[in-house]
Amino acid sequence: LGDVYKRQVIWQVENPDEKVLYFSIGGHPAFMCPVDEKGKQSEYYFKFDTDKDLTYGLIADDGQGLLGQEEDVLPVAEDGYAQITKHLFDRDALIVENHQASVVSLCTPDKKPYLTVSFDAPLFGLWSPAGKGAPFICIEPWYGRCDRTTFDGSLEQREYGNTLQAGGVFRREYTITVE
């Protein structure tokens, strides 16, 4: 049996002001995939703590960095695995909302998990630079995200935005496990 390493990442936001603070926070941790120079990313898998297909949103292609209206589905098998295909990230990040999963693992071609990110965030992103052949994939827990292309409201009305009262503290964490 190999060693297992865990790293806990803690986000803490404090509001020292007398006014309400509106904010979003998210990570951008990147993990090697493939784990050696011989393999291809498209031979690897995600494993989720669900056997339901994941619905995800896509960044609009207008260059503004906003969430478009289009959604797609990442097929998840009954055992929780989803193939990382060659063109999965061609249209930027996969934005998975509504607590559809809280554990995401990267798995070798023989479906053995080598890295797991566990979180209680309401949404997360999966990303690797499109068309660059980058040797990594990001698994990004988020408490908030970019606005939709159709949004024209205030900070108080943002989807997945967070509110912190005067003197309040927001504390969340996620865990990275390497096997």
PLM segments and residue spans:
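Short Pro-Gly-centered flexible turn/kink motifs
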Residues: 11, 162-178
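Asparagine-centered strand-capping/turn motif at beta-strand->loop junctions
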Residues: 11-17
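A residue-level signal for conserved active-site and pocket-lining positions in enzyme catalytic cores
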Residues: 28, 139, 167
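Short, structured beta-strand/loop micro-motifs enriched in basic residues and often containing a Trp
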Residues: 149-156
